[in-house]
């Protein structure tokens, strides 16, 4: 494929700035080396970055405008964020007032243009930077300025990798936001369910005066009452009462006849053992 527009006059593209003299020196050095070696010069594509894209500016426009300076290859424009897009649509709908369908055009934030020759890309970026985009008086982009920058040693594969990385980061961020929203929803549902259980317990007849009741350990009397309620529990309760009465009668007889009580006899026998 023949490369168009390689031989460009510097007067047509405009004067070069002093900050890019180093790049020109490198190019001249490469050209002199190629001429000395007698080898054919290899055409290397170059990429120019567009930092500002006016509204309703499309890849076809940039291709038509920049094709006059050299052969343009691939062009990619980054669309605006979905949140900004929805905001603009809502603003357009409110401005229309519901009388007619609101007209909204998809806008872009930044773009990349590939030239077949990197030397042409460098010259275009230097000469057209901060110049009007439209040369005609009726052009809708007459009052917009070019914001061009040549990306040194940047290839189209680097751009593809960068865009794929941004898409992956966006997906991961979306998954994290969805997981966070799900956790918050589950916590809210559990809290609502717990509150419903508490409200349902307000009508419980086992809690007088609407006070909260908490389960405690049963007392000795309650335990005896439960045992007595079991089959055969009455007989065991009678035996326990008889044993208690016998113990009380034994202490009474000991007091009457002057004999020591069983507790005192145990207390007297303990020091004898210690001695």
Swiss-Prot record:
Keyword vocabulary terms for this entry: Acetylation, Coiled coil, DNA-binding, Nucleus, RNA-binding, Transcription, Transcription regulation
Top-level taxon of the source organism: Eukaryota
GO cellular component term of the entry, any: nucleolus
Molecular functions per Gene Ontology: DNA binding; RNA binding
Stretches assigned to coiled coil: 164-194
N-acetylmethionine: residues bearing it: 1
Name by which UniProt lists this protein: Activator of basal transcription 1
Organism: Bos taurus (Bovine)
Phylogenetic placement of the source organism: Eukaryota, Metazoa, Chordata, Craniata, Vertebrata
